[in-house]
Amino acid sequence: MAKPPLGLYYSTPAQGTCDRRTMAATDATGHSGEHKAKPPSSMTQIPSSSKSIEQDALSVVLVTAGYDHTIRFWEAWSGLCSQTIQYSDSQVNRLAISPNKRIVAVAGNGTVRLYECSPAAAMMSHSDTPSRGASVSPISSFDGHYGNVTSIAWHCDGKWLVSGGEDGTIKIWDTRTSRPQRVYDHKSPVNDVVIHPNQGELASCDQSGSVKIWDLGENKCSHELIPEEDVPMRSVSIASDGSCLVAANNKGRVYVWKMRSGVAEADQHEHTELEPVTKFQAHDTYITRCALSPDARYLATCSADTTVKLWSTSQYRFALNKVLQGHQRWVWDVSFSADSAYLVSASSDHVARLWELSSGKTMRQYNGHHRAAVCVALNDTSLEP
């Protein structure tokens, strides 16, 4: 689609509508999505005095990866590495844990691979998991990107997976057949893609500085936003209630839009409306990731300046709440606990850290990577049968 004129978070109005129905696909993980998430987080239920490490491993899936060609599973509360998997193909760029906590998707160069988050494997003795890692075969592979796969996200029932890459495409994969159902051309290398909570839209950003909304019902780009021409947009996040969209760029700036559902008069179909509400300078240099907390009360930003910053979203003011300091090099990724009380960060200093957000203190360090740790995924959501 044609680029809109330069302007502050310019929005191309939606053309057409979306019925908000998710795409038809089969769950390749062998599960029909019968597990439903419910609060609170398991993280706050694991004080060492009341829960064992084994229970920790079963209730919390914490994974890190990076440039040492390993994927590491951690016992979140003890800080011990429970399993290491070799990923010899390339560095690992992104991780995403399936909603049922059984599978981790791993994005590398040209490929997304799926590995089991096996409780049995997670409870192997540490003598059986050397630092170089075990050679474990993936249960599935998604091939088709050219160059690095920079982002991945799961459909809420695991029926499909979305990926974005340096080749300028977004691909939606059937998780059973490992084949792409949809391919969208972003016209520029994709840095991030997320799924709207309604499961009917995607938000993505790219190296040219654009943020796009993709309407899956209409099978097209419905909005294009260009906050700053030719300033790479690094990361996007959507609030869990679908109320706002946040994007962060290479100049350390954050842009925020309100998201509303509307109905087009022409065909009476539902569509998303975007309203710019604020922008602010979060860091003095590159922002590598932005993430809204599950309760939508906080925004976390991490940066090349070695910090993680926590911002209050109250009334869209985005006041600085805390600066989390302790990493020695770039911080590349962050992931919140389900109750928004904790956050895990991954850094070029080879270390991942668990932060208690009420105090701003590091509760655990996860040591074991031999090169930069650039991605982290945490899923401690309680599942009901």
Where are the regions a protein language model picked out?
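Intrinsically disordered, low-complexity acidic/Ser/Thr/Pro-rich linker and tail segments
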Residues: M1-W77, A121, S125-S131, L383
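Eukaryote-specific detector of the first structured module of a protein
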Residues: S48-R113, C117-P119, V374
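Residue-level detector of Asp-centered blade-edge/turn motifs that repeat once per structural unit
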Residues: D56-L58, P99-N100, C156-D157, P197-N198, ...
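Conserved strand-to-loop turn within each blade of WD40 beta-propeller repeats
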Residues: A65-D68, V106-G110, G164-D167, C205-S208, ...
